[in-house]
């Protein structure tokens, strides 16, 4: 029997639980008007209005087995030379993904952990320092690590962009046949939130490419400065699309919703999380994936701080623009594992 509900409230603390309560009206006001109407089916599948919407797989088990379960649910096996794109974490930041959490998945796909350098000012701004951070944070102990822009970057085309016609990524990306975009979902001081779309855009961008995105294609030498917040947010979506297009059919996306600070892993002294961990989600559609994570954050009883961060930066624009340019769909089916 199908029971209609107007909003999903999922409470995931230590045990697996999915609960649906309240009314869509209040949820849509807090989030945005396009929150899809969902209903629960007998097989625990949460289905938006369009039954053929992209699947997003969810588990509340934030452990190696949970991570493996959502990866396997995708039905797309990472093959060839596999890159696993993570955030190595700024020294002093305790919130980046734990190597012990991701080790089994990385080794199952025989993956190489990949990253790109940041702009000057960070302790990950050059390859030598960045490799040392990766070692200090335990990543070199579980897999090879490659800094994609350690020697050069390359231009890849952006199709359908409003601001960008090209995107600058680490040149060593061409060494890999398949991309696993493994992201820590959290707040962000510039983008409002960081998930798959940010990891695909700023994450794969070279040091100069990061400036290119922040400046909406005006310069490669401005660091993090943005003349227009909205143009920056839309440029992130466009840069993400260039990576998705390059690896079409050879890329998948996983978001881990733990250590949910309002700040990103690039800060050495981030704010402490003020909400409980939620779970791990995976999809073949990065827009659907980030949208599902945002919806879960909005539905959480303790999500006020991260919601405030998202809204104060107009962060939902990145998702909206990503859908507009054809990167993916905001409608999704959330399937519990």
Predicted regions and their residues:
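N-terminal secretory signal peptides that target proteins for export/translocation
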Residues: 1-4
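N-terminal low-complexity, Pro/Thr/Ser-rich intrinsically disordered segments
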Residues: 35-56
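Sec-dependent signal peptide cleavage junction
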Residues: 21-39
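Extended, low-polarity segments enriched in aliphatic/aromatic residues
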Residues: 50-337
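Intrinsically disordered, low-complexity segments enriched in Ser/Pro/Gly/Ala and basic residues
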Residues: 10-11, 25, 33, 52, ...
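Sec-dependent N-terminal signal peptides of Gram-positive bacterial secreted proteins and lipoproteins
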Residues: 7-26
């Amino acid at each position: 029997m199908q029971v209609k509900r107007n909003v999903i409230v999922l409470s995931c603390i230590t045990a697996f639980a999915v609960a649906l309560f309240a009314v869509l009206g209040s949820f849509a006001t807090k989030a945005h008007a396009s929150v899809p109407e969902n209903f629960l089916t007998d097989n625990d599948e949460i289905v938006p209005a369009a039954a053929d919407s992209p699947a997003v797989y969810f588990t509340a088990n934030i452990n190696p087995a949970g991570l493996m379960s959502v990866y396997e649910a995708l039905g797309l096996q990472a093959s060839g030379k596999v890159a696993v794109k993570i955030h190595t974490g700024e020294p002093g930041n305790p919130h980046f993904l734990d190597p012990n959490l991701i080790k089994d998945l990385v080794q199952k796909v025989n993956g190489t952990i990949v990253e790109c350098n940041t702009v000057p000012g960070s302790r990950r701004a050059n390859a030598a320092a960045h490799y040392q951070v990766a070692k200090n944070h335990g990543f070199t102990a579980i897999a090879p690590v490659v800094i994609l822009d350690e020697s050069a970057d390359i231009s890849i085309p952006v199709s359908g962009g409003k601001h960008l016609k090209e995107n600058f990524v680490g040149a060593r990306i061409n060494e890999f046949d398949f991309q696993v975009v493994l992201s820590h979902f959290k707040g962000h001081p510039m983008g409002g939130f960081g998930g798959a779309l940010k990891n695909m855009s700023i994450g794969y961008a070279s040091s100069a490419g990061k400036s290119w995105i922040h400046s909406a294609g005006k310069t490669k030498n401005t660091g993090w400065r943005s003349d227009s917040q909205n143009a920056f947010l839309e440029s992130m979506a466009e840069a993400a699309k260039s990576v998705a297009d390059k690896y079409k059919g050879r890329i998948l996306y996983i978001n881990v919703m733990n250590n949910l600070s309002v700040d990103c892993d690039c800060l050495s002294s981030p704010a402490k999380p003020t909400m409980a961990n939620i779970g791990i989600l995976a999809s073949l559609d990065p827009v659907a994936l980030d949208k599902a994570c945002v919806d879960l954050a909005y539905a959480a009883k303790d999500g006020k701080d991260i919601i405030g961060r998202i809204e104060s930066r107009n962060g939902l624009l990145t998702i909206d623009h990503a859908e507009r340019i054809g990167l993916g769909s905001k409608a999704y089916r959330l399937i519990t594992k």
